[in-house]
């Protein structure tokens, strides 16, 4: 058993080794606690603040993006309404322009028709006057041949022409 006890002592350190190891461990722990731990804590706090700030910025950016999207949607809706209104106004104005053009065209057509009608009536009057004059000359010549003499008096010619025209008008009616 002596050998077993000596083998166990090989694995267990001596008490002074344990004591000085504990003293060094406490010194190193105090050194870490006083110098390194505050620096690490400051770095960790700074990093946590950055992360929290980044999260807050991201949330604010998301909120701003949502507001911008809502504003954009409202503007888009307003633009669509405005475009619809402009399109309807343009259609109404086009209808009004077409109606005005149609009215002017009808008025112009009526004016042209009236002018043409007056021109036709004027030409008809001129043709009738010209025809009466030629018929009168022909009638006088014919009457002169029939009567065997020439009708020389203007009054007689005029009376005869008027009678023939009156007869033609009465036959016409």
From Swiss-Prot:
**Known SUPFAM superfamilies for this protein?**
F1F0 ATP synthase subunit B, membrane domain
Keywords on record:
ATP synthesis, Cell membrane, CF(0), Hydrogen ion transport, Ion transport, Membrane, Transmembrane, Transmembrane helix, Transport
What are the record's GO terms for cellular component? plasma membrane; proton-transporting ATP synthase complex
- Stretches that traverse the bilayer: 18-38
The record's Pfam families line, in alphabetical order, gives: ATP-synt_B (PF00430)
How is this protein positioned relative to the membrane? Single-pass membrane protein
Q: Which InterPro entries match?
A: ATP_synth_B-like_membr_sf, ATP_synth_b/b'su_bac/chlpt, ATP_synth_F0_bsu_bac, ATP_synthase_B_chain
Where is the protein found, in the record's own terms?
A: Cell membrane
Single Gene Ontology MF annotation: proton-transporting ATPase activity, rotational mechanism
* Functional description taken from the UniProt entry: F(1)F(0) ATP synthase produces ATP from ADP in the presence of a proton or sodium gradient. F-type ATPases consist of two structural domains, F(1) containing the extramembraneous catalytic core and F(0) containing the membrane proton channel, linked together by a central stalk and a peripheral stalk. During catalysis, ATP synthesis in the catalytic domain of F(1) is coupled via a rotary mechanism of the central stalk subunits to proton translocation.
> What quaternary arrangement does the UniProt entry report?
F-type ATPases have 2 components, F(1) - the catalytic core - and F(0) - the membrane proton channel. F(1) has five subunits: alpha(3), beta(3), gamma(1), delta(1), epsilon(1). F(0) has three main subunits: a(1), b(2) and c(10-14). The alpha and beta chains form an alternating ring which encloses part of the gamma chain. F(1) is attached to F(0) by a central stalk formed by the gamma and epsilon chains, while a peripheral stalk is formed by the delta and b chains.
Q: Which family does it belong to?
A: Belongs to the ATPase B chain family.
What PANTHER family does the database record attribute to this sequence?
ATP SYNTHASE SUBUNIT B (PTHR33445:SF1), ATP SYNTHASE SUBUNIT B', CHLOROPLASTIC (PTHR33445)
**Can you name this protein?**
ATP synthase subunit b
Species source reads Bifidobacterium adolescentis (strain ATCC 15703 / DSM 20083 / NCTC 11814 / E194a)
């Amino acid at each position: 058993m002596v050998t077993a006890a000596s083998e166990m002592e090989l694995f267990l350190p001596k008490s002074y080794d344990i004591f000085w190891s504990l003293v060094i461990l406490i010194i190193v722990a105090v050194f870490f606690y006083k110098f390194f731990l505050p620096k690490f804590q400051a770095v960790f706090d700074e990093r946590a603040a950055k992360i929290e700030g980044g999260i807050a910025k991201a949330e604010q950016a998301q909120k701003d993006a949502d507001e911008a999207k809502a504003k954009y949607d409202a503007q888009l809706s307003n633009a669509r309404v405005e475009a619809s209104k402009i399109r309807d106004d343009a259609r109404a104005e086009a209808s009004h322009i077409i109606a005005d053009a149609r009215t002017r065209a009808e008025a112009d057509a009526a004016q042209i028709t009236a002018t043409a009608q007056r021109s036709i009536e004027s030409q008809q009057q001129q043709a009738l006057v010209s025809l009466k004059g030629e018929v009168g000359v022909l009638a006088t010549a014919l009457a002169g041949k029939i009567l065997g003499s020439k009708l020389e008096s203007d009054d007689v010619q005029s009376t005869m022409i008027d009678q023939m025209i009156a007869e033609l008008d009465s036959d016409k009616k």
